[in-house]
UniProtKB/Swiss-Prot annotation:
Annotated function: Lyase that catalyzes the C1-decarboxylation of 4-hydroxy-3-methoxy-5-(all-trans-polyprenyl)benzoic acid into 2-methoxy-6-(all-trans-polyprenyl)phenol during ubiquinone biosynthesis.
Keywords: Lyase, Membrane, Metal-binding, Mitochondrion, Mitochondrion inner membrane, Transit peptide, Ubiquinone biosynthesis, Zinc
Organism: Coccidioides immitis (strain RS)
Name the record gives this protein: Ubiquinone biosynthesis protein COQ4, mitochondrial
Gene (UniProt): COQ4
Positions with a binding annotation for Zn(2+): H166, D167, H170, E182
InterPro entries tied to this protein: Coq4, Coq4_euk
GO terms of biological process kind: ubiquinone biosynthetic process
Keyword Lyase attributed: yes
Pathway: Cofactor biosynthesis; ubiquinone biosynthesis
Entry's localization field: Mitochondrion inner membrane
UniProt family annotation: Belongs to the COQ4 family.
Pfam families per the UniProt record, alphabetical: Coq4
Length: 283
């Protein structure tokens, strides 16, 4: 009897050892030439070394050229795991609207939103504000790239949702897509979402012109910290259901403070410089 128990125990031990060896073998086989199957369409699994290298390279590249949206997107994905994107997903799961968004999986594109209809809405609505902001900045909701480097399929959708809602954040704050405006909005987003890429983007402020730096540090960074911390979790806003609402009412509900109009500020500075230059020429 004792011998039989010993044999069975050894058999169980051997099976456990085989499973452990198989798991280690799979881990060793995960390489550039032998990747696991993707978890969703477009998914590219990465090893920890690949993820780190891609994060560093993309961060440096986006710092040198803040207009490289593809690099910024890559930094966002490679630095969001393992903690930050799960925190954002959990914030959605803890909110009734957030849970509906995760269940419905809406997408924000020119096919899902009728821009001509939004342009026809009253001027005080969220939809009109969003559509006219797109027109003024010359951008489209179709420019957001698909998530590739986040392994969890649900978390990948959360990142995609954040990415596609970004222009709504621009619209309700009024910030333009010039580098100065993007950095200000990223600082606001970091305080609201804690996505590392949004915080890292603030370092791009070192490349601003002196007068732009002064504005950022004195006006827009304090605004971003104050408003980003005070506002509700924006990832839980079902923007598609807010299009006909009064934009000021929504700002108040979300506790979003609108910053000074950056385009007006830049325009006035240009006019002052032009007037000063003309005065010098006349004298």
């Amino acid at each position: 009897m004792a011998i039989a128990k010993s044999v069975r125990a050894r058999a169980v031990g051997l099976r456990s050892l085989r499973v452990l060896c198989a798991q280690r073998s799979v881990a060793r086989e995960f390489s550039v030439l032998n990747r696991p199957q993707p978890n969703y369409p477009g998914h590219i699994p990465l090893t920890p070394i690949e993820r780190g290298a891609l994060a560093i390279g993309s961060a440096v590249g986006s710092l040198l050229n803040p207009r490289r949206g593809d690099l910024i997107a890559t930094v966002g994905e490679t630095t969001a795991t393992p903690f930050f994107i799960y925190r954002l997903r959990d914030a959605m799961l803890a909110d009734p609207t957030g849970r509906r968004i995760l269940r419905d999986r809406p997408r924000i594109t020119s096919q899902t939103l009728s821009l001509p209809y939004l342009r026809s809405l009253p001027k005080n609505t969220v939809g009109y504000t969003y559509a006219t902001w797109l027109d003024r900045e010359g951008v489209s909701p179709d420019t957001r790239s698909s998530v590739q480097y986040i392994d969890d399929e649900e978390c990948a959708y959360v990142m995609q949702r954040y990415r596609e809602c970004h222009d709504f954040y621009h619209a309700v704050t009024g910030l333009p897509i010039v580098v100065e405006g993007e950095i200000a909005l990223k600082a606001f987003e970091f305080m609201n979402t804690l996505i590392p890429m949004t915080g890292l983007s603030v370092f791009a402020a070192i490349r601003l012109k002196p007068e732009e730096k002064q504005r950022f540090w004195s006006i827009h960074l304090p605004w971003a910290i104050r408003s980003g911390l005070a506002s509700k979790e924006l990832i839980n806003v079902y923007w598609e259901e807010q299009l006909e609402r009064d934009v000021n009412e929504l700002r108040e509900e979300l506790n979003i403070e609108k910053p000074p109009d950056l385009r007006d500020i830049r325009k006035k500075v240009r006019e002052q410089k032009k007037a000063a230059k003309e005065a010098v020429i006349k004298s």
